[in-house]
Amino acid sequence: MARISGVDLPKKKRIEYGLTYIYGIGLFTSRKILDATGISYDKRVADLSEDEVAAIRKEIQEHYMVEGDLRKEVSMNIKSLMDLGCYRGLRHIKGLPVRGQKTKTNARTRKGKRKTVGAVSAAANKE
C-alpha cells in the first residue's frame, strides 16, 4: 500500500483516483501530478514501483500544499477574516452562510437545529 502525505492510498483503485484521497488533491490536480511524473493514469496503486511513489511524493511536496498544512492555512484565513471584523468574518462568527445565500427559510445545515421561540415565552407568561 502506497503512503503519501500520511494517507494510505487504496490498492485496487487507479492512481488518478487514489491520489484524490489526499486532502487538497482533486482529479484535475491528480492528473497534473501524474503528467509531471510521467506515470500513466490507468496504473493501479498496487502496481506502482517505489521509484514512482517517490516521484509522486516529491512532486506533491515541492509544488502542492496538502493535508495538515492546507487545513491549517484555511483555518487561519477564516480566523483572520473573523479578526478583521469584515462581513464574511462576522458571518463565520454567527454561524450563518457566508456567500450570500438566503436565510429566511433555508440554511439549516449552517444554522443548526430549529429553536422554537413562541412556545417558551408562552409558558413563561402563564406562571
Swiss-Prot record:
Q: Where is this region: Disordered?
A: 100-127
For this UniProt entry, the molecular function terms from Gene Ontology, in alphabetical order, are: rRNA binding; structural constituent of ribosome; tRNA binding
- For bias type Basic residues, the affected ranges are 101-116
Q: Which domain of life is it from?
A: Bacteria
GO cellular component terms? cytosol; small ribosomal subunit
Q: GO BP, one example?
A: translation
Q: Pfam families recorded for this chain?
A: Ribosomal_S13 (PF00416)
Q: How does it assemble?
A: Part of the 30S ribosomal subunit. Forms a loose heterodimer with protein S19. Forms two bridges to the 50S subunit in the 70S ribosome.
What does the sequence similarity comment in the record state about its family?
Answer: Belongs to the universal ribosomal protein uS13 family.
Quote the NCBIfam families the UniProt record gives: uS13_bact
Question: What protein name does the entry list?
Answer: Small ribosomal subunit protein uS13
Give the gene symbol: rpsM
